[in-house]
Amino acid sequence: MLKNQVSIIIAVYRDVVALDLILKALKNQTYKKFEVIIAEDGQSEEMKEFIDTVNDLTIKHLSQEDIGWRKNKMLNKAIIESSCDYLIFIDGDCVPHEKFIEEHYNRRKNNFVLCGRRTEPGEKFSTLLREGKISIDMFFTSYLKNYFHLKKDEIRHYEEGIYCKQNSILEKLITIKSSRKEAHIVGCNWSCNKEDILKINGFDEDFELPTTGEDTDIERRMRHFGIKMISCRNFAIMTHLHHKKNFNHYTKQLLPQPSEAQK
């Protein structure tokens, strides 16, 4: 039996359909020696029931009470539970290309963080993926051919979904271009050695609202310890699934509510 070398940590919240697509994509990865840690910032019965049905993957499912945005706390638990020396972090609404893990693992270096990005198709293509009318493999293999359809669908960051093969001319061109532009952590797609993130004591759990700088914070602290950022854009690629962004659920739990007299 192959010994796992990589822990894939997936931060999830309620979106079972997206997780299903992610796990299907993980089953089709070219690199096989990995475990999956599902870090659920909540305790959805639907999520648990679905995960219990999944076969052919080594999965650890961690959850916690749904009392506000506590993603960082959940990620710290996942780091502790991981059994591998190399960690890849992805979000639960982002589906990886079949070579995603292979690219992260083969490009790893000591004292470096690999920083990737994501492409963001609009509602039409995201719905096709969610409904199973196209697979993630079909999405990426026809990516260039569907350029105009994707643009019509108001895709964002189209260039981030172009996969670059190893040792190709395109790889050399992109590597040169990437070296001119400093890499930064985006929480949906990055990886590091486990010892490096333990060195900085993991994620700061004082961040209790999304998009408030938790990615920037962990990058800043890693740089302080001499850990450098390197780009894996166009090598470890993934696509985001379109959804409405609504943070009211979290702000209502954090902000004091007006009394009856104040209403």
Where are the regions that the model predicts?
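Short, acidic, metal-binding catalytic loop of nucleotide-sugar glycosyltransferases
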Residues: 24-33
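Short aromatic/hydrophobic "clamp" motif used to bind/position activated sugar donors
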Residues: 87
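Conserved donor NDP-sugar-binding/catalytic core segment of glycosyltransferases
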Residues: 99-153
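A short, conserved alpha-helix in the catalytic core of glycosyltransferases
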Residues: 184-192, 196-201, 208-227
